[in-house]
Structure formats: structure tokens, C-alpha cells
Amino acid sequence: MSSGGLLLLLGLLTLWAELTPISGHDRPTFCNLAPESGRCRGHLRRIYYNLESNKCEVFFYGGCGGNDNNFSTWDECRHTCVGK
């Protein structure tokens, strides 16, 4: 196969991996956790995955502790937890 063909194949595989939906079996288990504000008293706007609505939603994080269902951006949450 030519180098151009290999690059095309690599590009298609990368695109497929990005666009393939996340199933419940592929979703990290921490996505199923309820949002946890943690033990500190900050008021940071963060994003968590809501298993019931299958959407990323806002919660307020204290700044320390908590769990891994805690994202800085909508895109990070969607890419990690939301099935498309």
C-alpha cells in the first residue's frame, strides 16, 4: 500500500474512533457517580455527567476531594462519558 493510502487509512480510523458512540459498557465507572462537592469551601463551577439524563450538567465544586466525575469543560465531560 502506498504512503498516501496508509495516511488515508490512518485518518479514517482516527475519525471513526472519535465519532463512535460510547456505550454503557465502554463508559468509565466514575461517570456513574453522583457529583461530589468535596470537603473544601470553594465555589467552583464544574461539569459532571448525569447518568439519568445522559447529559453533562453543572455543579459547584469546593476545590478539594470529591470524585472523578468532575470536569473542567463540557467537551471533556461529553468525550469521556456521553454516548452520542
Swiss-Prot record:
Residues 31-81 form the BPTI/Kunitz inhibitor domain. Its main location: secreted. The record marks R41, G42 as: Reactive bond for trypsin. The keyword Signal applies. Keywords: Disulfide bond, Glycoprotein, Hemostasis impairing toxin, Protease inhibitor, Secreted, Serine protease inhibitor, Signal, Toxin. InterPro entries: Kunitz_BPTI, Kunitz_BPTI_sf, Prtase_inh_Kunz-CS, TFPI/VKTCI-like. Transmembrane segments: none annotated. Residues 1-24 form the signal peptide. Glycans are attached at N70. Gene3D superfamilies: Pancreatic trypsin inhibitor Kunitz domain. GO terms for molecular function: serine-type endopeptidase inhibitor activity; toxin activity. It comes from the Eukaryota. Expressed by the venom gland. Serine protease inhibitor that inhibits plasmin and trypsin. Belongs to the venom Kunitz-type family. This is Kunitz-type serine protease inhibitor B4.
